[in-house]
Amino acid sequence: MQTTPEPVPANSAGPAGSAGSTDGAGPAAATTGVPASPDAPLSRPGLIFAVSAYTLWGVLPLYFLLLAPTGPFELVAARVIFSLVFCVLLLTVTRGWAPFLLLARNPRVSFTLGLAGVLIFVNWQTYIYGVLNGQVVETALGYFINPIVTVFLGVFFLREKLRIVQWVSVGISIAAVLVLAIGAHGVPWIALILAFSFGLYGYIKKRVGGTVDAVSGLTLETAWLTPLAIVQLIVVGATAGLTIGQVSVFHTVLLVGTGVITAVPLLFFAAASRRLPLIYMGFIQFFAPVIQFLVGVFILHEAMPVERWIGFILVWIALVVLTTDTVISARGSLRRRNKAASGAPQQL
């Protein structure tokens, strides 16, 4: 996206072991219901929904750049508030208030989504700061390494044991970050904050499982964040000054539209997750950072010195290693399940 680039959301592990996104750029913001089984046939509508979601997350930098001279703090606050407004409208139109209120009255779910909201707020703030400060390529890096960071977090929080190949992938990624840090004479903080905030976001969202639909999840998260967003707007208004309503009608419409461009890819992602096997979702998740990378290099002409190319190539190698290992493991698990099913006694 996942968030999504831009987090996004869903929290099912794809081939890279990542949490599906709701949007930092992605994806990022809700669970998606029951996913298709690994051996389910490929759904053309599901494929269209998935590609549409990740493509929209991929081109988000261009949308945000159209909002100049709005700064990152005003933009993130506006995004939170207008996302909440749009979600409220969706709940009203789809008659989704009953299940939403049921979730909101559940203290565990509500608090968990509030904590997830804080993480996605950090993710959005970092992402938009990077985009508006000429660091689109580094934001793409954050979402490239997110699947590997998610695997890394699983070791510490879930006490998961990694296979040797997975450790190799993590090691290559660490080497990539070191190369990028040496080349840039500084740690790529934007990429690391994006990757870890979205990885932690996915971990927390797993705690509520598939009980929260996309719209209700985003509504609860943005509702928790709205007081913070209002305070942020007050501070911006008292210092730099607000731009909403001060530039042009087109600019104001685009700013209000941040709520729509946050929710629509998330809904596409939710629809895709219900129709496509997770292994396909895992591959398609790389559409967003690939598009962001291409936007940064070929449209915005961000610098790509040799050290940066080496760092990115190492990250891509790590992803190929991790994805290949996960696909092989998934196929092995599927064969074992099929063998167990075929050997089960038949009822008469």
Residue ranges and their predicted role:
Residues 67, 75, 79, 114, ...:
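Hydrophobic/aromatic residues within transmembrane alpha-helices
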Residues 55-59, 63, 114-131, 193-204, ...:
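Hydrophobic alpha-helical transmembrane segments of multi-pass membrane transport proteins
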Residues 2-52, 85-113, 164, 212-213, ...:
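Membrane-interface interhelical linkers
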Residues 3-4, 182, 187, 286-348:
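C-terminal-most transmembrane helix of multi-pass membrane proteins
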Residues 141-145, 211-224, 263-298:
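Helix-helix packing/entry segments at the starts of transmembrane helices
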Residues 56-84, 138, 200-225:
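Juxtamembrane helix-loop-helix junctions in multi-pass membrane proteins
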Residues 129, 146-166, 290-309:
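C-terminal transmembrane-helix exit sites in multi-pass transporters
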Residues 62-72, 99-101, 131-135, 177-178, ...:
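Membrane-interface helix termini and inter-helical loops of multi-pass transporters
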